[in-house]
Amino acid sequence: MRRYSIFAVAREALRYHSGWEKAWASPEPKKRYDVIVVGAGGHGLATAYYLGKVHGIKNVAIIEKGWLGGGNTGRNTTIIRSNYLQDPSAAIYEKARSLYEGLSQDLNYNVMFSPRGLLMLAQSEHEMRGYKRTVYANNLQNVETRWIEPKEVKKLVPILNIAGPRYPVLGALLQEKGGTARHDAVAWGYARACSDMGMDLLQNTEVTGVRTEGGRVVGVDTSRGSIDCGKLAIVVAGHSSVLAGMAGFRLPIESMALQAWVSEPIKPTIDVVVMANLVHGYMSQSDKGELVIGGGTDGFNNYSQRGSWHHVEETTRALIETFPVISRLKMLRQWGGIVDMTGDRSPILSKTPVDGIFVNCGWGTGGFKAIPGSGFAMAELVAKGYSPLAAEFGLHRFKEGQFIDESVAAGVAH
């Protein structure tokens, strides 16, 4: 496949862009693959990519019941950060953030990574103490964060109301290397790279069953026929429990809707990501000028990709007190995705009771920011049976009580 470059853009401009190749192939499924990855979102595609790049396993199929990146990867608010409290969390998220820095060059695809900085506002004494604790922990974890006072917060975000009577800003945790990336580009870049390595991307192919023999996986049944495999990676976010049920085991997760919405485009107003966990809201500005706003999960289990209007009202009302200038903006569109929540708000990257089946799920509200690190660790787990990054995120922790409590760092998810 031809590499993208400024010279390729110039060449295609001269011939009216008629010579671009398809970014990825759409082949018919083969009878057997060494590894089948179910889920062509960011995590599934990254897993396949690092299986090929790092471990040399290229006889891989990525199966997607819909279209590539049509799940949570294309429905999130694109925030990237690694300022987590617990050591295992900080390690995998910082690995992801560092991979994002060079991902455009690695994939030869511009993922539009923008390390614009990220603020987590402390709007109560409790939050202030908690964020200072996180800063101290991050310093020990080699994650660059620092505490800043209200005056510096106001300097970074002039439109912020730091002296509101209900939600005063007492300071903020700042991660200057945090930021955003283009979610579609991340999925498309990984898909293109996987296809270039000879992997098969099977869209509109629903898995209807998992076949096992003697306690080991041997293949899957799909809407396009049966496919044999040596190993199976389940990477389907909110539908992980459905696939696990097909294989005969249960997962300690629950699925909920998480939604986001954007305003009409306005001139550049805010050039950092701002998270206000006390009011369950966060906001950034897109390249097109839209204010991208996210809120909390619905308070009940569901598989709706719409969310509920009361969350829009509650979050917007609280953010207006924090950012009064946005009160007259119109909402342009709203959408939702299905997030998979664990009890300790940390992910699951693990072997399963069925030999040869691996699961990557439970990322909750933090899935997009973890894509490269998650894929790197999952690929190592599938290829070698063990990954240092994934070791503490196994299913065993729920049986043994070795929880990785990230209910505070997860922000809007607790």
Curated annotation (Swiss-Prot):
Subcellular location: Cytoplasm
EC number: 1.5.3.24
Flavoprotein found in the keyword field: yes
Any GO MF annotation of the entry: sarcosine oxidase activity
Binding site for FAD: 42-43, 64, 72, 77, 79, 207, 364, 367, 369
Co-factor binding comment: Binds 1 FAD per subunit. Binds 1 FMN covalently.
Cofactor entry: FAD; FMN
Summary of subunit composition and partner proteins: Heterotetramer composed of subunits alpha (SoxA), beta (SoxB), gamma (SoxG) and delta (SoxD).
Protein name: Sarcosine oxidase subunit beta
Organism encoding this protein: Rhodobacter capsulatus (strain ATCC BAA-309 / NBRC 16581 / SB1003)
Gene responsible for this protein: soxB
